[in-house]
Amino acid sequence: PNMRLTMSLVLGVMAVIALVGALGGAPKDANLYQTQKALDNAKHAVKKGGTIILIGACPEGLGSKTFESWLVNAPTAHSMVERIGKQFQLGGHKAAAIGMVLENAAIDLVSEMDPDFVRSIFLNPRASAQEAFSAAMEKYGQDATVIAMPFGGATLPICK
């Protein structure tokens, strides 16, 4: 059955590391266009300067042609944010949303996409969730605050 579940997660503090998944398989993690929904929720849980570890298989790559065009042709992540302010375009809005997240946090992507391609769209490729988590813990230290959001697309963190 196709159930739509939305959870609110009340946080006492914002995390330095958010481990977020687009679990549930396709279509939730079919491509980055779909997986971005989990990223958009996770941004509310991470402190400025933190890292979001985004887990989504993305076997179809990026997804939308417009989304792809915005990502691959952007000279910088911030340029997508500037562009959406001047020229709203469906598909481009999701690329700009990624650009906005990147202004506050690093994004490590665990996916099936080619690592060089992932780097070219301003994300840090990781081979596994364990590799990404270990790298983040090394960067921030063992006392880092961590939040796990396995169903990121259906979880909205609220910081109190």
Task: Please state what every model-predicted region is.
Residues P1, A15-K28:
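Membrane-embedded hairpin module used as a gating/binding unit in multi-pass transport
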Residues N2-T6:
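Membrane-interfacial loop-to-transmembrane-helix junctions in polytopic alpha-helical membrane proteins
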Residues M7-A15:
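Single-pass alpha-helical transmembrane signal-anchor segments in small membrane proteins across taxa
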Residues K28-T35:
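Glycine/threonine-rich flexible loop motifs
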Residues T35-K160:
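C-terminal non-catalytic interaction/assembly regions of soluble proteins
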